[in-house]
Amino acid sequence: MKNIVLSILLMSACAMIYAQADSSPYQAIVAVDGSGDYKTVQEAINAVPDGQTKPWLILIKNGLYNEQVIIPKNKPYVHLIGQDKDKTIIHLNLNVGSKLTGKEIGGKTAYWEHSVHNPSSPVYKYEGSVVVVKGDHFYTENISYVNDWGVLSDNGPQALAMNSQADCASFYNCKFRSFQDTWMLSLIHISEPT
């Protein structure tokens, strides 16, 4: 009888622990140290089901996320929630500087190494921003969005940290850092005839 009672208690405890693990409000957790569901923000976004009609919450744990993040048009309602805006940082070193012409002002050509137009650059053919939001109903809080090029160089070509092309995008308690054109809003919605 004692073994039966112990078995029932053990099964009940396991069921409670399992229920608590499932009670997280987040559909995904990103942690650069590997303690979450994903190590990069883009991996978590890629896993979001297409055509969401309600918020898909992604917790991003404190850390430095050196990557470009693109939320595609077919992934609306993505919510990126960081732990602390000073410790949850999505950053990358890129700019949209054109090919060198030999007539650069003051001979400044260092930007070309990190230009999205340079075939030798690690960011060649990237979209021209650290984060590009195309999915509507985007929400984010407690995250810093940083274009390292703009912060480190304090001069040069356009170096976007955020490019929001989404309808109904909200930003709460976030930081945006770069040198030129840090945050770009470019919304084009064409209504179809009814």
Regions flagged by a language model, labelled:
Residues 30-37, 52, 57, 76-157:
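Right-handed parallel beta-helix/beta-spiral solenoid domain characteristic of secreted/periplasmic
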Residues 39-50, 66-74, 80, 184-185:
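Short, T/G/N/S-enriched strand-turn elements that build extracellular solenoid repeat scaffolds
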Residues 53, 65-70, 89, 149-155, ...:
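Short glycine/acidic-rich loop motifs that flank beta-strands on beta-rich extracellular proteins
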Residues 61, 72, 81-83, 134, ...:
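Feature marks extracellular polysaccharide-active and adherence modules
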Residues 186-194:
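Residue-level detector of conserved catalytic or cofactor/ligand-binding positions
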